[in-house]
Amino acid sequence: MFLWTDDQKNAFLRLKEALTTTPVLGMPTTTDVFYLDNDGSDVGFGSVLSQRQGDREVVIAYASRVLSKAERNYDVTKRELLAFVVGLKTLRHYLLAQHFVVRTDHSALQWIRRMPEPMGPLARWLTLLEQFDFEIQFHSGVKKCKLRWVVEETALRRG
C-alpha cells in the first residue's frame, strides 16, 4: 500500500527544489564535455544534461515528457531511443557543434547507428542523430535517481 501524506508531499517538494536550484543546477561552460543521460519508463521519459566542472558533476538542464498512448506500446529499446531523441531535440541548443557523451544502461543503444535498414520512425530518428557529434557509453547500472525523478514528476503533473 502506498501512503501519501503531507510529510511525503513536503519531502517531495523539498527534493524537487533541491534538484532544480544551484548548486545542483548550473551554467554550462564552453570547455567542459556535456553528458546526456536518458531514461524511459512505462509512463514517460526524461533526460538530464550535465557537465563535469572541477571535482563535481553539475546538472545543466532537464527534459521530460509523458508517453502517448501509442508510445506506451513501444518495446523497451524503442522507448529508450525515443527518450534519447526527444532529449536531443529539446536540448539541441546546447549540443549542436559540440562533442558530447551519451551514458546509458541500455546496451542496445550502442549499435543503433549501425542498424542496416531502419524503417519508419527509426529511420527518421537515425537521420536526426546524424546532426550530432556524440559517443555512446554503456554503463551497467548507471545512476538514475535524477532521471527517475524527472520521469515520475512529469507523469504526476500530467496525470
Annotated model-derived regions:
Residues M1-G159:
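Acidic, metal-ion-coordinating active-site neighborhood of RNase H-like domains
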